[in-house]
Regions:
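Sequence-structural signature of mature extracellular/luminal beta-sheet repeat domains
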Residues: 26-360
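Bacterial N-terminal signal peptides
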Residues: 12-22
């Protein structure tokens, strides 16, 4: 998810009627050239927009074991309507075929899915949010199409609005639970990150991660990265024109992960509120096989994909112009160095110099 001011900036271009398309390549919006280490992002690498038929916020891009690219389309019900302008959309998961360029609806309603990952067996695991969404973690068997609720309650109470997830090599799923929009009552005591063990046990592993958003485990399984992206509001869609919020922590944080999947030793790698030009924090992220972090940065003056060392030092930067990116994901096999990213209504790709990490 993202900041209220960034979302509202794009609403004027949305309108009441949303056309769902499965077209191939769209017009290149002409992004600035990437900068930084050419071994990370080669000179001349360009973003290619392959889809622009979402409503407001595409998210959660991930490569399936079938070679297809799946991503969420969070259709805010106050803004994304049918042709009559009366009835809100119920969320979509799209499927993009890299070989044909065709993009089709994989699932609708989506339960307002946000983050998507695939486990080692090829099952899709999706974090469902609020705003008439599922507020749960769901696994889909990609062979049968059947879905299963992995967790929908913590301490007997509904989650706020699941946002993003990461899966470790022991099959444990870590997920974040903030709230950015939706009419549903909030029952949890705060924002947090959780761990779902293979036996179904759910543990709150971090209550000190701010408004927890993107989450990523390092390839060596020793470090957990968690984004705090705090817009200072629970239901941005109800803010009146001109109203402002007091925004809090915008951070890239790291934790140690022990053998049991518990987190400790929290430290802040980047405080986006204390940069020379303070800005909103990042969103989703993935890792390459060397442990570098590829992160969707939503800095208002510099939106794009930041490539960082495990210590938070920038190696390269892929500008998305005025587009505010939401999430990233690597392809598989021969396309392991093909980076996919979601932003606004669109899906993009760019060939980079590193291979993405996937579960073995």
């Amino acid at each position: 998810m993202t900041k209220v001011q960034n979302i509202k900036r794009g609403l004027a271009a949305v309108g009441a009627t949303v056309v769902l398309v499965g077209a191939a390549h769209a017009v290149d919006p002409g992004f600035p050239a990437p900068i930084g280490d050419p071994s990370v992002v080669p000179a001349g690498a360009k973003l290619d927009r392959v889809f622009d038929g979402g409503c407001i916020l595409t998210e959660g891009v991930a490569a399936g074991h079938d070679g297809m690219i799946y991503f969420s389309d969070i259709t805010f019900t106050k803004f994304c309507k049918d042709a009559s302008g009366k009835f809100g959309q119920a969320g979509n998961i799209w499927k993009h075929n890299p070989k044909t360029g065709e993009t089709t609806v994989f699932r609708s309603p989506s339960g307002m899915s946000n983050g998507i990952k695939f486990d080692r067996d090829g099952n899709m695991v999706a974090a469902l949010g609020a705003d008439f969404g599922g507020q749960m973690l769901v696994r889909t068997d990609m062979k049968t199409g059947k879905s299963y609720i992995l967790t929908g309650l913590f301490d007997g109470k509904p989650y706020n609005a699941l946002n993003d997830l990461t899966i470790d090599e022991k099959g444990r799923i870590y997920f974040t639970d903030p709230r950015y929009l939706g009419h549903e009552p909030i029952f949890q005591d705060g924002f947090a990150a959780y761990r779902l063990d293979p036996d179904g046990t759910v543990t709150r592993v971090a209550a000190d991660c701010g408004k927890c958003n993107g989450i990523l485990i390092s390839p060596d399984q020793k470090t957990m990265y968690i984004i705090s992206n705090d817009n200072g509001w629970f239901a941005f869609e109800n803010l009146k024109q001109g109203e402002k919020t007091l925004q809090s922590a915008h951070l890239l944080q790291a934790y140690d992960v022990d053998a049991n999947g518990n987190l400790s030793n929290r430290r802040v790698l980047i405080d986006y509120g204390k940069l020379d030009k303070p800005c909103s924090g990042p969103d989703g992220m993935v890792a390459d096989t060397e442990g570098n972090i590829w992160m969707a940065s939503r800095c208002e003056h510099r939106p794009g994909i930041q490539v960082l060392t495990p210590q938070g030092k920038e190696l390269a930067y892929i500008s998305t112009g005025k587009e505010m990116p939401t999430n990233v994901g690597f392809g598989r096999g021969a396309d392991s160095n093909l980076l996919w990213l979601t932003s606004g209504k669109s899906l993009y790709k760019i060939r980079v110099g590193k291979n993405g990490y996937q579960l073995p």
